[in-house]
């Protein structure tokens, strides 16, 4: 290979290297701009829940045009679960409180990921995480008690069971004779038949309701 061929080959490599470096620089700038745009879009959607409906309509239109199926838009309103024994955890929370809770979970996940690499959150993020955790605990205590009104009166102690349940009074409801230990069926050998206003027969006589005494 002649010296001119070697120079032309080196020049071509230099040009290719310069183009590669320039394109990678453009790529980094574009990725940084894309991340900034995505964060701004996310913030707008969090502050304006109604935008989720617009996103859903756009995705539905795209699906009708033959595009790939997209994920469902996140619902900001409370999901109703009809399963017995379960209650919604979103009871009494505002949109801002839900955003704070999601921010706390995101910071906790970030802290775990950084801890895996031997790193820590910044001092500002640590302080924010402590504040959000403290606010979350206060909210949990706020909604854990029984609701005012309804079963529980507005003033005075609650009438229901701890946690807001209601134990109704059994006044006027006939009791089962098999569970009574007062004047009822002689289940312990210390009582007699409940006469309820009838005069008991003399000792040695037994009377059964519906039958004629002998």
Swiss-Prot record:
It is found in: Virion; Host nucleus, Host nucleolus. Residues 43-185 are annotated as: Disordered. Residues 128-143 have a biased composition (Basic and acidic residues). One of its GO terms (cellular component) is host cell nucleolus. The keyword Lyase does not apply. Keywords: Acetylation, Host nucleus, Lipoprotein, Methylation, Phosphoprotein, Prenylation, RNA-binding, Viral penetration into host nucleus, Virion, Virus entry into host cell. Residues 96-106, 135-145 are annotated as: RNA-binding. The modification Omega-N-methylated arginine is found at residue 13. A motif (Nuclear localization signal) lies at residues 65-74. Residues 20-194 form the HDAg domain. GO terms for molecular function: RNA binding. Residues 12-59 are annotated as: Dimerization. Residues 212-214 form a propeptide. Following virus entry into host cell, provides nuclear import of HDV RNPs thanks to its nuclear localization signal. Needs co-infection with hepatitis B virus to provide surface proteins, otherwise there is no packaging or budding. Packages the HDV ribonucleoprotein in hepatitis B virus empty particles. Interacts with both HDV genomic RNA and cytoplasmic tail of HBsAg. May inhibit viral RNA replication. Homodimer. Homooctamer. Interacts with HBV HBsAg. May interact with clathrin to induce virion budding. Belongs to the hepatitis delta antigen family. This is Large delta antigen.
């Amino acid at each position: 290979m002649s010296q001119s061929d070697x120079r032309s080959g080196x020049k071509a490599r230099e040009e290719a290297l310069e183009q590669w470096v320039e394109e990678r620089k453009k790529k980094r700038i574009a990725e940084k701009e894309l991340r900034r745009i995505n964060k701004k879009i996310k913030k707008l959607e969090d502050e304006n829940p109604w935008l989720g409906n617009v996103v859903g309509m756009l995705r539905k239109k795209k699906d009708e045009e033959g595009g790939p199926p997209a994920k469902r838009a996140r619902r900001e309103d409370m999901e109703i679960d009809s399963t017995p024994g379960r209650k919604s955890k979103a009871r009494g929370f505002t949109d801002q409180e839900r955003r704070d809770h999601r921010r706390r979970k995101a910071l906790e996940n970030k802290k775990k990921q950084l801890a895996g690499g031997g790193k820590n959150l910044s001092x500002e993020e640590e302080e924010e995480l402590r504040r959000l955790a403290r606010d979350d605990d206060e909210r949990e205590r706020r909604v854990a008690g029984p609701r005012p009104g309804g079963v529980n009166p507005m003033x005075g102690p609650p009438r229901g069971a701890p946690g807001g349940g209601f134990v109704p009074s059994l006044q006027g409801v006939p009791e089962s004779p098999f569970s009574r230990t007062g004047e009822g069926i002689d289940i312990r050998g210390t009582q007699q038949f409940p006469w309820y206003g009838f005069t008991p027969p003399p000792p040695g006589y037994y009377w059964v309701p519906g039958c004629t005494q002998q």
